């Protein structure tokens, strides 16, 4: 399905044409590392699914934001960074900080257990959100 070129993509393209660097948009995900370890011992596939659920929900929820629209226009250039939170408390503290700072995100809760598993931000220029994520390392 072809949707045409939207205004967000035109802004990014116009910046590139003018010689200005286009904004690099990144979707950050923060996934609980402890879920892969005892006593939880979730398999890798289950953790990947949680990150996918959170990312999809964040993109859908913020689909009308210009950054999300521009991010989705360049399917071959989408950038995601998956970081790890050591536990549920740390993940929920991050969600609270993001909420207080008006950073658009989705805290994914696995149902029916209601377990917080992952946070996905909508696509952002890394300069806008890096300060909130710098204490988290890449998920391994």
From Swiss-Prot:
Outcome, altering residue 122 to Q: In NEDPBA; uncertain significance
Enzyme class: hydrolase
Molecular functions (GO terms): peptidyl-tRNA hydrolase activity
Disease / disorder: Neurodevelopmental disorder with early-onset parkinsonism and behavioral abnormalities: An autosomal recessive disorder manifesting in late infancy or early childhood. It is characterized by developmental delay, intellectual disability, learning difficulties, behavioral abnormalities, and parkinsonism and spasticity usually developing in the third or fourth decades.
Function description: As a putative peptidyl-tRNA hydrolase, it might be involved in releasing tRNAs from the ribosome during protein synthesis. Some evidence, however, suggests that it lacks peptidyl-tRNA hydrolase activity.
Family: Belongs to the PTH2 family. PTRHD1 subfamily.
Protein name: Putative peptidyl-tRNA hydrolase PTRHD1
GN (gene name): PTRHD1
């Amino acid at each position: 399905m072809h949707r045409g070129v939207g205004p967000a993509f035109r802004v990014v393209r116009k910046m590139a044409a003018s010689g200005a660097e286009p904004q690099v948009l990144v979707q950050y995900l923060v996934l609980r590392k402890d879920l892969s370890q005892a006593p939880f011992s979730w398999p890798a596939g289950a953790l990947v699914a949680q990150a996918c659920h959170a990312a999809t929900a964040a993109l859908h929820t913020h689909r009308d934001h210009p950054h999300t629209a521009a991010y989705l226009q360049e399917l071959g250039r989408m950038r995601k960074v998956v970081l790890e939170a050591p536990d549920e408390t740390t993940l929920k503290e991050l969600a609270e900080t993001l909420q207080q700072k008006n950073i658009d995100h989705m805290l994914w809760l696995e149902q029916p257990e209601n377990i917080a598993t992952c946070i996905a931000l909508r696509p952002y220029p890394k300069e806008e959100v890096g300060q909130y994520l710098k204490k988290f390392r890449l998920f391994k």
